C-alpha cells in the first residue's frame, strides 16, 4: 500500500478513536525517502473542528536541514542536465497521479486545515492546473535566436535554471501553494527545498509520495519542517538562489529582507484587503450570492477572500438581503455534507478574529451579524466563527486597516463609483478587487482606474489560471516576478545570451584584425 493510502487509512482510523499523545509523526522527505527526524522539538497539529491532535511535526535539526540541502545540490548537477522532455514526462505522470488521488488529498486537507471537502478539492484542483501548465515546458522555456545579427554572426539566448531554490508555504492552501512552487521550479531544471506550513504538513507529504511514483529522481525536491530556524536556514544558505513565499505580512517582509540581503531572488505574496464594489445596476441576486460565497467561503482564510464590500448609492438598500443570505450558510466540520463554512485554523486565530470584530464595534461600526458565539453540536471544542458582518465601517477603523483572515465582511458605503475607487486605491494592499455592474462603461472605468493586481468584473475571486500569473501589487507583494505563468518561469530561470562568429573565411589563414569591431 502506498503512503497515500496508508495516511488516508490512518486518518480514517484516527477519526474513529479518541485522540492521544500517540498521534503519528510527520516525516522529513530527504533524497527520495521519508525520514524520521531526530529532533527533540515537536509541534502538535490539531484538527480545527475537534481540537484533537492528528500528527506531530518535527522542527528539523540543523544537521537534517543541511543534509536536505546537500541532497538538493547533488541532484541539481544531474537533474539540470536531463532533457527537457524527461522533466516534462515527470509532470505528465504527476498530473495523472494527483487526479487519481484527489480524494485522499482533500480528506487530509480537511482534517488538518478545516475547510470543507468541496473547497479542499478546489485547493488541489487549482494546484493541479499549474502542474498541467508545466507540461508545456518545452514551449515555456524556449529561448530566442536572431541569425546574422552581423555578417556570419548569430545571437541566441538560453533560458537556464538557477540551481537550488526554496519554497515556504502557508496554512490556508495546503496543496495549491506548494503546487505553485515546486512543479515550476523543477520543470525548469532547478531543485527545491520545500517547507510547508507546520500547521498543515500532510498534503505536501502526500504530494511527495506521488512525485516519487512519477519518477522524479531523489533529491530534486526535499521537504523540511519547522518554524523560525527553518526559515532562517533557507534565507541564509548561500547555495539557495531563490525563495518563494506566500503568507503573512510579517513573515513575508522578513523573508524578503533577509533573503534579499543574502543575494537571493525572492517572490513574496503577503496580506490583502480585497474590496468588492457593488453598483446599483448590478444583478442583485447573483451579486449577493457571489459576495456571500467570496467573503465567507473557506472561513475567509483566502488571500483573495472578498473581505470588504463597498456599496454604492442605491445598492446600499441590499445590505439586509446580504445578511439574510449569510445567516443561511451552514457552519460545521468540513467533512460534514452540506457544510458551507468550516472552522478557522486555530484557537489563536479565532481569538484574533473576535478581537478585531470587537474593535470595530468599539470604534463605531454596526455589528449587523455576529458569529462569535456560534456553537456546533458535536464539535464544541472546534475553532468556529460564524459569518459576521460589520456595517458603517470607515477606513480608519482597525477592522478595516488589518487583514482579518476570517469569516468577517466589513461594509463601507460610497455615494459614487469615483468615491469607491478612491477608497480602494487609498488602501495599502493591492492583491485583488472586483466590481459588480451591468454597465460596461462603469466596468471599464473601474478596470482602468483601480490600483490592484487582479481585477474581477462580476467575478468575485479573480485568481488567474496558470497561463497568466498571480499578480498582486503594492503592499500585497514584494519581488520582481510573480507566481506561475510566464512570470513564474522567469522567476526560476536566468538568461544566457550567446553571440557566436563563424566566418566563412575562417577555413583559411587570415591576418589578425586589430581594429575595434563595428558589427558590420
UniProtKB/Swiss-Prot annotation:
Residue positions binding NAD(+): 169, 171, 195, 198-199, 248, 403
PROSITE patterns: ALDEHYDE_DEHYDR_CYS
Source domain of life: Eukaryota
UniProt EC number: 1.2.1.27
Alphabetized InterPro entries for the sequence: Ald_DH/histidinol_DH, Ald_DH_C, Ald_DH_CS_CYS, Ald_DH_N, Aldehyde_DH_dom, MeMal-semiAld_DH
Location, primary (coarse class): mitochondrion
A molecular function (GO) term: malonate-semialdehyde dehydrogenase (acetylating) activity
Coiled coil (UniProt feature): none
Entry annotation: catalytic residues: 303
Keywords: Mitochondrion, NAD, Oxidoreductase, Transit peptide
Catalytic activity: 2-methyl-3-oxopropanoate + NAD(+) + CoA + H2O = propanoyl-CoA + hydrogencarbonate + NADH + H(+); 3-oxopropanoate + NAD(+) + CoA + H2O = hydrogencarbonate + acetyl-CoA + NADH + H(+)
CDD domains referenced in this protein's UniProt entry, alphabetically: ALDH_F6_MMSDH
Subcellular location: Mitochondrion
Gene3D superfamilies per the UniProt record, alphabetical: Aldehyde Dehydrogenase, Chain A, domain 1, Aldehyde Dehydrogenase, Chain A, domain 2
Single GO cellular component term: mitochondrion
Signal peptide location: none
GO BP terms: pyrimidine nucleobase metabolic process; thymine catabolic process; thymine metabolic process; valine catabolic process; valine metabolic process
Keyword Transport carried by entry: no
Protein family (similarity comment): Belongs to the aldehyde dehydrogenase family.
Functional summary from the UniProt entry: Probable malonate and methylmalonate semialdehyde dehydrogenase involved in the catabolism of valine, thymine, and compounds catabolized by way of beta-alanine, including uracil and cytidine.
Assembly behavior: Homotetramer.
Protein name in UniProt: Probable methylmalonate-semialdehyde/malonate-semialdehyde dehydrogenase [acylating], mitochondrial
Amino acid at each position: 500500500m502506498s503512503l497515500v493510502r496508508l495516511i488516508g487509512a490512518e486518518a480514517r482510523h484516527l477519526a474513529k478513536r479518541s485522540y492521544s499523545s500517540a498521534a503519528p509523526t510527520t516525516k522529513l522527505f530527504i533524497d527520495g525517502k521519508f525520514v524520521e527526524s531526530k529532533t527533540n522539538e515537536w509541534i502538535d497539529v490539531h484538527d480545527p473542528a475537534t481540537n484533537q491532535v492528528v500528527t506531530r511535526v518535527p522542527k528539523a535539526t540543523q544537521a537534517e536541514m543541511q543534509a536536505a540541502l546537500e541532497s538538493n545540490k547533488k541532484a541539481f548537477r544531474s537533474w539540470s542536465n536531463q532533457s527537457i522532455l524527461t522533466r516534462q514526462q515527470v509532470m505528465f505522470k504527476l498530473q495523472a497521479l494527483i487526479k487519481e488521488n484527489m480524494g485522499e488529498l482533500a480528506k487530509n486537507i480537511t482534517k488538518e486545515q478545516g475547510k470543507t471537502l468541496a473547497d479542499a478539492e478546489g485547493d488541489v484542483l487549482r494546484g493541479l492546473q499549474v502542474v498541467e501548465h508545466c507540461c508545456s515546458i518545452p514551449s515555456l522555456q524556449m529561448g530566442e535566436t536572431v541569425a546574422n545579427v552581423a555578417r556570419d554572426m548569430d545571437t541566441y539566448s538560453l533560458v537556464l535554471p538557477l540551481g537550488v531554490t526554496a519554497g515556504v508555504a502557508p496554512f490556508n492552501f495546503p496543496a495549491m501553494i506548494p503546487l505553485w512552487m515546486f512543479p515550476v521550479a523543477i520543470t525548469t531544471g532547478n531543485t527545491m527545498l520545500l517547507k510547508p506550513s507546520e500547521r498543515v504538513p500532510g498534503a505536501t507529504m502526500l504530494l511527495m509520495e506521488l512525485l516519487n511514483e512519477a519518477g522524479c529522481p531523489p533529491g530534486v525536491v526535499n521537504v523540511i519542517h519547522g518554524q523560525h530556524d527553518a526559515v532562517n536556514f533557507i534565507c541564509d544558505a548561500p547555495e539557495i538562489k531563490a525563495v518563494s513565499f506566500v503568507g503573512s505580512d510579517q513573515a513575508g517582509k522578513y523573508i524578503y529582507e533577509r533573503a534579499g540581503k543574502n543575494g537571493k531572488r525572492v517572490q513574496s505574496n503577503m496580506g490583502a484587503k480585497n474590496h468588492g464594489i457593488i453598483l446599483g445596476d448590478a444583478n442583485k441576486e447573483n451579486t449577493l450570492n457571489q459576495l456571500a460565497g467570496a467573503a465567507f467561503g473557506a472561513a475567509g482564510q483566502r488571500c483573495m477572500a472578498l473581505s470588504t464590500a463597498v456599496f454604492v448609492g442605491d445598492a446600499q438598500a441590499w445590505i439586509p438581503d446580504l445578511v439574510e443570505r449569510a445567516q443561511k450558510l451552514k457552519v460545521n466540520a468540513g467533512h460534514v455534507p452540506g457544510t458551507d463554512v468550516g472552522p478557522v485554523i486555530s484557537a489563536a486565530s479565532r481569538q484574533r478574529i473576535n478581537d478585531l470584530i470587537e474593535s470595530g464595534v468599539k470604534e463605531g461600526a454596526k455589528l449587523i451579524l455576529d458569529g462569535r458565539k456560534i456553537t456546533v453540536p458535536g464539535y464544541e471544542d472546534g475553532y468556529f466563527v460564524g459569518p459576521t458582518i460589520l456595517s458603517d465601517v470607515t477606513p480608519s477603523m482597525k477592522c478595516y486597516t488589518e487583514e482579518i483572515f476570517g469569516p468577517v465582511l466589513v461594509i463601507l458605503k460610497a455615494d459614487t463609483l469615483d468615491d469607491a475607487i478612491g477608497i480602494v486605491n487609498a488602501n495599502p494592499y493591492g492583491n485583488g478587487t472586483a466590481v459588480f455592474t451591468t454597465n460596461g462603461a462603469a466596468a471599464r472605468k473601474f478596470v482602468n482606474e483601480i490600483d490592484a493586481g487582479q481585477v474581477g468584473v462580476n467575478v468575485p475571486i479573480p485568481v488567474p489560471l496558470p497561463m497568466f500569473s498571480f499578480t498582486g501589487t503594492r503592499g500585497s507583494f514584494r519581488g520582481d516576478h510573480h507566481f506561475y505563468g510566464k512570470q513564474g518561469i522567469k522567476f526560476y530561470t536566468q538568461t544566457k545570451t550567446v553571440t557566436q562568429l563563424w566566418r566563412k573565411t575562417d577555413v583559411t589563414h587570415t591576418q589578425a584584425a586589430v581594429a575595434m569591431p563595428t558589427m558590420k
